[in-house]
Regions:
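Glycine-rich beta-alpha loop elements in corrinoid/cobalamin-binding modules
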Residues: 79-225
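Iron-sulfur (Fe-S) cluster-binding segments and ferredoxin-like electron-carrier domains
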Residues: 276-292
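Low-complexity, highly charged intrinsically disordered N-terminal segments
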Residues: 42, 46-47, 53-88, 92, ...
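N-terminal pre-triad scaffold of radical SAM enzymes
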Residues: 44-48, 66, 250-277, 301, ...
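Conserved SAM/AdoMet-binding glycine-rich loop
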Residues: 44-45, 298-406, 411-443
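N-terminal [4Fe-4S]-dependent radical SAM core
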Residues: 13-43, 50-51, 207, 214-262
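Helix-enriched interaction subdomains in cytosolic or periplasmic regions
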Residues: 1-19
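Flexible loop/turn segments at secondary-structure boundaries
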Residues: 50-53, 82-85, 118-120, 153-156, ...
């Protein structure tokens, strides 16, 4: 099915499904290139619904990096909601890209973001919807190469039968290495020949060149190389310096989970919380200079129309220049009614000076991440914060003019009891009580 036929069928399907804006494309700042003028065509598949996937920073970064190159194109695809999936299957319409409405089968590479393991089943469902064989050994040179990346692919073996390659580490540089190599492939080249060329790229794990070995109890033991030329060890790719951030991200037509402009200010973390995978694999810490952040905001705001900027990192209050940065934003964007969002702050790193700096901006809520509601459990996960520290911090936040505090908790920590779970509600009520005592019914 070509994209002309696909568009005709979509004209019949979309009026019948919930939130058709998930499936139309055409958003502000979307990039559409001439299909015939391109050397390598990539679909960026985020195996979640559009509402969630469009808020993923990694997708935004790769879309920007690939499309800056004149000979490559990147288009987006997401898994549909159940009504749209049913309609696609009934009409035999393959999963397609939003920009050009080409079936995913038409692309050279299917680049899949897998930030967490719960997306594995969505990923396989997306392959099936795209009419791409699920198992890699059932695919031919006529199918796109399926390359996955993201935090959950640091252990790629659970999905190894379904992929051609996995990126281990950060993707900004390796994606261009992959595309440059692919651009040198000859027409009709077999998949195995393509993978033989790609295996020379550092940070790329290609399962076909290895055989997993398991212990008697079924646990994983090691990998045995099936070809001598395969790397003995896959070295994690690390970007030494953060590349320029996207300053013209796509603005969705519909509500997404984060309706704001994203701007990464720091990558990595030194805290070492025992539950946190991202805090380990994204080391070392790299900070974006204040001047670069301010210059990006100068274009990001008019390019998107957003009035809220998310200063993103694993813990933005640990950014060493956070107070000078917020003060500089206050000064440069005074009178523009710009809100600053600092997601998921560590309680012990929230200072009075930071709250003083933030208090001059339009408030969008304050988010703290105790992660566990009892001191015993917080000590176990290496977040040694007392209940009193949390309550004192909450009081300071309320006193500085915030009415809403969001608390992040997780259920399922090792040694957790029902008392620990009940403490989530109890501690939340104590924080609310502090708010009522401090600012009254506005809390």
């Amino acid at each position: 099915m070509d994209n002309t036929q696909l568009n005709k069928k979509l004209g019949k399907i979309l009026p019948k499904v919930e939130m058709p804006g998930r499936y139309t494309g055409g958003e502000f700042n979307q990039i559409v290139k001439n299909w015939e003028d391109i050397d390598v065509r990539v679909t960026l598949l985020f195996p979640e619904i559009y509402d969630l996937g469009m808020s993923n920073l990694g997708l935004t970064i790769l879309y920007d990096i690939i499309n800056r190159e004149p000979n490559y194109l990147a288009e987006r695809s997401f898994v549909p909601w159940v009504d749209m999936e049913t309609a696609l299957r009934e009409e035999n319409v393959p999963l397609y890209s939003l920009e050009s409405k080409h079936p995913l089968l038409d692309f050279d590479i299917l680049a899949v973001s897998l930030p967490y393991e719960s997306l594995y089943t969505n990923f396989l469902n997306a392959l099936d919807l795209a009419h791409i064989p699920i198992h890699s050994n059932d695919r031919t040179e006529d199918h796109p190469l399926v390359i996955v990346g993201g935090h959950s692919t640091f252990n790629p073996e659970p999905i190894a039968p379904f992929i051609d390659a996995a990126v281990i580490g950060e993707g900004e540089e390796i994606i261009l290495d992959i595309l440059e190599t692919y651009a040198g492939f000859q027409p009709g080249m077999s998949t195995i020949d393509k993978l033989n060329r790609l295996k020379k790229i550092e940070g790329l794990y290609i399962p076909i060149f290895y055989e997993p070995v398991y212990n008697e109890d079924g646990t994983f033991s090691n990998l045995e190389k099936m070809v001598p030329e395969a790397p003995n060890q896959i070295i994690k790719r690390i970007v030494g310096k953060l590349p320029p951030p996207p300053n013209k991200p796509i603005v969705p037509y519909i509500d997404t989970v984060h309706n704001r402009a994203p701007l990464e200010i720091m990558r990595g973390c030194t805290r070492g919380c025992r539950f946190c995978h991202a805090g380990i694999v994204t080391r070392p810490v790299r900070e974006r200079p204040v001047d670069e952040i301010l210059e990006t905001m100068e274009t990001l705001i008019p390019n998107t129309g957003y009035s809220e900027i998310g200063l993103l990192s694993l813990s933005s209050s640990d950014y060493t220049q956070i107070v000078p940065l917020v003060e500089a934003i206050n000064e440069r964007f005074e009178g523009q009614n710009i809100a600053i969002s600092l997601p998921s702050l560590r309680i012990e790193s929230v200072s009075v000076s930071l709250m003083d700096a933030l208090s001059g901006k339009r408030r969008s809520g304050f988010t703290l991440a105790p992660e566990a509601a009892t001191e015993r459990l917080r000590n176990i996960i290496n977040k040694p914060i007392s209940d009193q520290q949390l309550l004192d911090t909450a009081k300071e936040i309320y006193q500085h003019g915030w009415h809403t505090i969001k608390l992040y908790f997780m259920i399922g920590h090792p040694t957790e009891t029902l008392d620990d779970v009940q403490a989530i509600a109890d501690l939340s009520k104590r924080v609310l009580k502090v708010g009522l005592q401090t600012i009254g019914s506005r809390a």
